């Protein structure tokens, strides 16, 4: 047999660079493969039936067909270390697949020997059609040098194998006949499992081979290769393969069929790969009409775009217009120059900057199936949902958690994809039923059909995979996208459950939402994935936008139904680790004595807690503060990247999502300054120029309205601050966008910087009301509110109202838990059986003792600046019962500190505002009511604030006088009494009080040491009598004593007593204006 000197390029690539032999691998293997293929058998003409004169072509296997097939399998293993896959190319050239298909069809029903031959042939078919992961192959050979491998020819060969396999239904029918006897056995041994697995893998391989991409006018082979997947699905349905898949999936929890759940998962993923649930739910009879309507709409949109360009210079009527400037003369050869802006036309002639094309990924390779195939999949999908989805997914998740060897990393992606597909498909079916027959027909498809993936254990595993993919270096983008899409559909499922008419669904949705939102990591992930988008695929961009839109919408809806929310937030372990390292380093430097190693206890290290393990703390949560976190430049860049593709949006939904997220930033977070950039304004101009091609939907109108609002704000700000035009060229850091165009605070103060240092040394300005006005608390609050509101700092008041609402909700929860209500219906009794006095609107002492101090923690830079250096806002905080800790002194530190460290500590204490624990809920509620009333009807100031307020004198810090040389005894190190400074009367009184207290304490200790039982009994009887008298007095006269044990003083009439800046809570409540 003569071989060609140079094989065709498709089958004979250039030999690998690492082979130095005179004959390459092709010349070595091809003769052997061709010889073995010829020995397999051949076709002959057979008269059937005999003496009929009718002949048909029948394949006759050779006498040694079984041995030849085994030799071919040995040759196939030669490709294990060959990147070029030379043996596979030789087998394609020798047309081995044609022989193997004929052997399977001919020998499958020829008894035991025929089954054995057919199984070996099926093994080779599975090897030849095994999916080729081109990306993974290229990644593996990347480090081996300049290896050039022609994978396109291998993929083309597999496509021809698939076409050969689907010419008739006999090959698939023969493979099914090999599996059925093994499936029918009640107890399957290892051989039966291998036969079933082999048949399923052959079907999986055929489904994995992608169709060729052909134009609408393609004919012949191109048109045939573009519809192979539809033909395969049709044959699988006619040969009951789909029913077999349903059986295996529904029995995946059985011991004998559980080994096949992973391969069934792979098959189902390949069946539904590239199919949109929205297309599957449509009436397939109307699909051609809808497709034609979409094409006409696309053509109309393109014509509308072209009409704006107008005629060119090659049109029938030429037009030439000259544009003259001060030093230039420009000639325009366009008819549109008559009516269009010349500057705009000149911009069109500029060289366009090349835009990097966004790539698509594996999850978005859509297929175009025939109507018959889609009808089959509609029935199969509905049956899969009703029969086996929960059972099948549960078995897969159980195997994943148990880390069985059959589970591969790619199986996670398949679970996510199928789950998101079937959840979306179920929701679309329910929506369709709701439109047709109302809510009664929804019982036909309950939401519990996909309940398994919505279980909390499944959601936790899903989020764990999302975090792992996010933390990987490099990130696993495909699996991350599948996680996000599945998470989005689970959220939509929970949202549908919350609005269901079934009370059980509503209750489950409430529990799931509480557990989801309690974990702050889930909420933070929505912000992270949107913020960290760079240059990933288009489908990934669409997924993260959809995820953020759904999560924010549902979280806002849920938060409106709750008076307060709490979240479990991870602590900053990185900061703790730094502090721990610094402390250990300092201790090491000071350490004078070290313990020898032989005396060390190794067991202590083993049982020591893991200091690097993440720790969590519970925090109050408000949706407004979380929503403001989306007002970042990185998030804006992601939204604008998505918005740039507005002409490619498939329907109004993508536009609705991006406009909704932009609305949250601009309107609700008041972050329109983030869009004051030149690149953003260019995008807005493109949209406004092409708004006539936008779909006629409410989302398009909302987009135009939002853009107009941003532009109006921008130009209004430019008119006020021209420097905004310069700021529009730079990025907007956090906190900077609210002060775009504002002047710097570091201007020259004409004192060589001394004024700034003096202000820093003096600390923040403290204000107080002038005493002669004698304002009530409500009047003081209205004045402070009017000043802050007039300065445009209304967002600070909204923020402090949110903080007070959090504190109020926390304290009310303690009161309800402890007292069972603020006003009890029955008198309670204490431990001694005595009836307690009713507290009309006041919590019990036990509830008050459980109150904790609330530390004010500003998050944004504006809030930090306000609590630190805004005197009017600090005055309002004092009126709201907030307080500051006393400034630290040198004696407060155990070790000597430098002046810089002391100044830093004092600076921190000036902004460490806290709400004391003894502030009652009623006072907080009254403060909130007053602020909300002022927000609805802002008060106005008739007088100048300078006439109402004045600067509060800061208390001078007294220093301890150092002892003089004469008063110091060098021998004893003490100060001589005779040389001590003379004490004033106030110091004498303080010293006497201390001595008296010490004497009483000593007397008390001596009395307690007395062990006379009679004296002890008289003491307790006397105490019991006094307690009864106090209870009777309290019941008759209310509460004559204040909380601190001081009798309330009457106001003086001599004008010397002024209204305090922060009156007691009990006094404030009577002065409030509601």
From Swiss-Prot:
Region: Disordered, residue numbers: 572-595, 936-1074
Residue ranges with Basic and acidic residues bias: 1014-1031
Record-level GO BP terms: DNA repair; DNA replication checkpoint signaling; meiotic cell cycle; replication fork arrest
Keyword Nucleus among UniProt keywords: yes
InterPro entries cross-referenced by the UniProt entry: Timeless, Timeless_N
Pfam families (alphabetical): TIMELESS (PF04821)
GO molecular function (one): DNA binding
A GO-annotated cellular component: replication fork protection complex
Keywords: Cell cycle, DNA damage, DNA repair, DNA replication inhibitor, Meiosis, Nucleus
Domain of life: Eukaryota
Protein's UniProt keywords contain DNA repair: yes
Broad class of the protein's primary localization: nucleus
Composition skew (Basic residues), residue ranges: 948-962, 978-991, 1046-1055
Entry's localization field: Nucleus
PANTHER family, sorted: PROTEIN TIMELESS HOMOLOG (PTHR22940:SF4), TIMEOUT/TIMELESS-2 (PTHR22940)
Family per similarity comment: Belongs to the timeless family.
Function: Involved in chromosome segregation during meiosis and DNA damage repair.
Descriptive protein name: Topoisomerase 1-associated factor 1
Species this chain originates from: Cryptococcus neoformans var. neoformans serotype D (strain JEC21 / ATCC MYA-565)
């Amino acid at each position: 047999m003569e071989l060609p000197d140079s094989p065709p390029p498709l089958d004979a690539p250039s030999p690998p660079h690492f082979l130095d032999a005179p004959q390459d691998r092709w010349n070595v293997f091809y003769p052997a493969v061709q010889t073995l293929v010829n020995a397999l058998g051949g076709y002959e003409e057979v008269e059937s039936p005999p003496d009929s004169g009718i002949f048909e072509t029948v394949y006759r296997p050779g006498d040694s067909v079984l041995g030849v097939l085994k030799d071919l399998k040995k040759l196939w293993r030669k490709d294990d270390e060959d990147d070029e896959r030379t043996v596979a190319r030789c087998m394609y050239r020798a047309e081995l697949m044609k022989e193997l298909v004929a052997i399977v069809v001919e020998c499958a029903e020829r008894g035991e020997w025929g089954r054995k031959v057919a199984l070996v042939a099926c093994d080779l078919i599975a090897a030849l059609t095994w999916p080729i992961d081109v990306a993974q192959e290229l990644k593996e050979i990347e480090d081996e040098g300049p290896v050039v491998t022609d994978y396109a020819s291998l993929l083309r060969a597999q496509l021809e194998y698939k076409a050969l396999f689907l010419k008739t239904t006999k090959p698939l029918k023969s493979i099914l006949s090999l599996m059925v006897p093994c499936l029918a056995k009640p107890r399957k041994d290892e051989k039966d499992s291998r036969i079933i697995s082999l048949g399923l893998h052959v079907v999986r391989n055929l489904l994995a081979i992608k169709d060729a991409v052909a134009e609408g006018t393609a004919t012949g082979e191109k048109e045939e290769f573009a519809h192979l997947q539809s033909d395969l699905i049709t044959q699988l349905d006619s040969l009951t393969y789909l029913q077999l898949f349903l059986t295996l999936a529904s029995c995946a929890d059985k011991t004998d069929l559980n080994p096949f759940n992973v391969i069934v998962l792979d098959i189902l993923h390949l069946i539904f790969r590239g199919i949109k649930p929205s297309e599957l739910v449509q009436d397939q009879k109307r699909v051609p009409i809808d497709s034609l309507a979409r094409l006409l709409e696309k053509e109309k949109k393109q014509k509308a775009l072209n009409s704006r360009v107008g005629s060119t210079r090659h049109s029938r009527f030429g037009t030439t217009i000259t544009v003259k400037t001060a030093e230039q003369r420009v000639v325009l050869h366009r008819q549109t120059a008559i009516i269009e802006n010349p500057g705009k036309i000149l911009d069109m002639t500029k060289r366009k900057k090349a835009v990097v094309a966004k790539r698509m990924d594996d999850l978005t390779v859509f297929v175009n199936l025939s109507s018959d195939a889609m009808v089959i999949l509609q029935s199969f999908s509905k049956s899969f949902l009703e029969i086996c989805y929960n059972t099948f997914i549960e078995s897969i998740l159980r195997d994943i958690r148990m880390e069985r060897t059959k589970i591969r990393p790619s199986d996670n992606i398949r679970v996510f994809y199928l789950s998101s597909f079937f959840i979306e498909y179920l929701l679309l079916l329910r929506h369709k039923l709701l439109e047709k027959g109302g809510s009664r027909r929804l019982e036909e498809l309950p939401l519990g059909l996909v309940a398994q993936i919505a279980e909390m254990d499944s959601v936790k595993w899903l989020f764990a995979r999302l975090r792992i993919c996010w933390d990987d270096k490099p990130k696993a983008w495909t699996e991350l996208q599948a996680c996000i899409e599945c998470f989005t559909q689970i959220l939509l499922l929970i949202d549908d459950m919350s609005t269901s008419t079934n009370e059980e669904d509503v209750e489950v949705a409430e529990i799931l939402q509480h557990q989801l939102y309690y974990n702050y990591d889930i909420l933070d992930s929505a912000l992270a994935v949107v913020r960290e988008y760079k240059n990933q695929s288009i489908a990934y961009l669409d997924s993260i936008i959809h995820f953020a839109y759904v999560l924010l919408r549902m979280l806002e809806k849920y938060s409106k139904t709750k008076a307060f929310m709490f979240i479990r937030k991870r602590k900053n372990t990185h900061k703790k680790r730094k502090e721990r390292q610094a402390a250990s380093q300092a201790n090491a430097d000071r350490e004078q004595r070290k313990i020898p190693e032989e005396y060390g206890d190794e067991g202590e290290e083993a049982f020591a807690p893991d200091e690097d393990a993440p720790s969590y703390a519970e925090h109050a949560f408000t949706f407004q503060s979380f929503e403001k976190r989306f007002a970042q430049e990185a998030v804006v860049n992601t939204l604008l990247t998505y918005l740039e593709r507005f002409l490619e949006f498939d329907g109004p939904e993508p536009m609705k999502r991006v406009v909704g997220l932009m609305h949250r930033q601009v309107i609700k977070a008041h972050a329109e300054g983030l869009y004051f950039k030149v690149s953003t304004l260019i995008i807005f101009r493109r949209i406004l120029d092409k708004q006539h091609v936008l779909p006629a939907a409410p989302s398009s109108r909302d987009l135009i309205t939002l853009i107009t609002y941003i532009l109006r704000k921008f130009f209004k700000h430019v008119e006020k601050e021209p420097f905004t035009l310069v700021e529009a060229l730079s990025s907007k850091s956090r906190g900077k966008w609210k002060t775009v165009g504002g002047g710097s605070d570091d201007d020259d103060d004409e004192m060589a910087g001394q004024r700034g240092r003096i202000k820093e040394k003096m600390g923040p300005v403290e204000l107080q009301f002038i005493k002669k006005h004698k304002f009530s608390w409500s009047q003081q609050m209205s004045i402070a509110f009017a000043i802050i509101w007039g300065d445009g700092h209304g967002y600070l008041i909204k923020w402090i109202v949110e903080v007070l609402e959090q504190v109020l909700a926390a304290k009310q929860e303690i009161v309800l838990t402890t007292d069972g209500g603020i006003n009890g219906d029955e008198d309670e009794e204490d431990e001694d059986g005595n009836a307690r006095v009713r507290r009309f609107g006041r919590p019990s002492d036990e509830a008050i003792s459980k109150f904790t101090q609330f530390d004010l923690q500003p998050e944004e830079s504006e809030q930090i600046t306000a609590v630190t250096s805004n005197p009017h806002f600090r005055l309002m905080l004092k009126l709201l019962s907030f307080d500051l800790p006393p400034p630290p002194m040198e004696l407060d530190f155990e070790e000597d500190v430098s002046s810089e460290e002391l100044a830093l500590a004092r600076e921190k204490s000036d902004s460490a505002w806290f709400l004391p624990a003894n502030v009652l809920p009623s006072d907080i509620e009254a403060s909130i009511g007053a602020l909300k009333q002022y927000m609805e009807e802002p008060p106005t100031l008739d007088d100048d604030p300078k006439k109402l307020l004045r600067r509060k004198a800061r208390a001078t810090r007294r220093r301890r006088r150092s002892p003089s040389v004469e008063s110091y005894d060098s021998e004893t190190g003490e100060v001589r009494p005779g040389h001590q400074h003379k004490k004033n009367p106030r110091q004498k009184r303080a010293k006497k009080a201390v001595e008296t207290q010490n004497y009483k304490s000593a007397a008390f200790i001596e009395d307690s040491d007395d062990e006379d039982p009679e004296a002890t009994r008289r003491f307790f009887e006397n105490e019991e009598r006094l307690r009864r008298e106090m209870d009777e007095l309290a019941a008759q006269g209310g509460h004559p004593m204040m909380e601190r044990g001081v009798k309330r003083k009457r106001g003086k009439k001599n004008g010397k007593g002024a209204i305090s800046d922060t009156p007691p809570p009990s006094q404030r409540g009577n002065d409030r204006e509601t």
